[in-house]
Every structure is written in structure tokens, then in C-alpha cells.
């Protein structure tokens, strides 16, 4: 087992294979879109879980290569499927509706965020993990600050 520094007073871990879907990319050579490449990766993960492998998954912005309604419906279905397979992991998202899954599965899902604060017209980060869904709209703040949004 690998040894890594951990910034905490105690830690309990359960050894599992780490599987990620973080840097999916498209391929003109293989005639494969970003979205299709992501679906293939998610299918590989589900297939491994169906075979009984114990995995810890880390997924970043799932289904971001499609429209928002399709993304939400597919993301909800994927999360439900992962829960049925008793999967542990982390899903990073900026989709506020996906954060509402905790209302349906309060014992299985936890929401955590890194909140950005706006102080003296500057964006600052504490880099502290907080419980809940991020409340600040830092994208609009940054766009306005850069002159990309004229009206509020």
C-alpha cells in the first residue's frame, strides 16, 4: 500500500480500487465525441461494479457534453444506479439540482462544497470543505468584473 501524508488527526480507510472519470477527451481520429467518450468510461465503471469489484469512484461534472435537461435526467439515473450498486465515491458538480438528491436519499448522500467569498470586491477562497451546497455565484461575479456582463 502507498503511503501519503494526511492532514487530519485521524483517518480510517477501506482499501478499494480508485476509479476516476476526470479528464475525458474527444478524438477526431476515432470519430468519438467528448460525450460518447465519457459514456464509454461510465459504462466501464458500471460494468466493473456489476462484476462485484469494490471501487471508490471520483467523477467530475458528469454528462457535461449534453444539454442541461438531458444531463440532469441522466445524472440522476446514474447516481441512483451507483447507489443501488452500493458504490462509494465523490461526484464533483456545479449542477445545483443534482445537489437536491440529498432530499431523496438523506442517509446515502452528503453535499460538501468549497465556498468562494466576495470580500472588498475580490474573490477569496478559504479552501475549507464546508457542508452543503455552495451559495455564492462567483462565475457571474467574475464575468461582471471582467466586463462580460453589462446588466445585472
Question: Model regions: which residues?
Answer:
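ATPase nucleotide-binding head domains, primarily ABC-like/P-loop NTPase cores
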Residues: 1-152
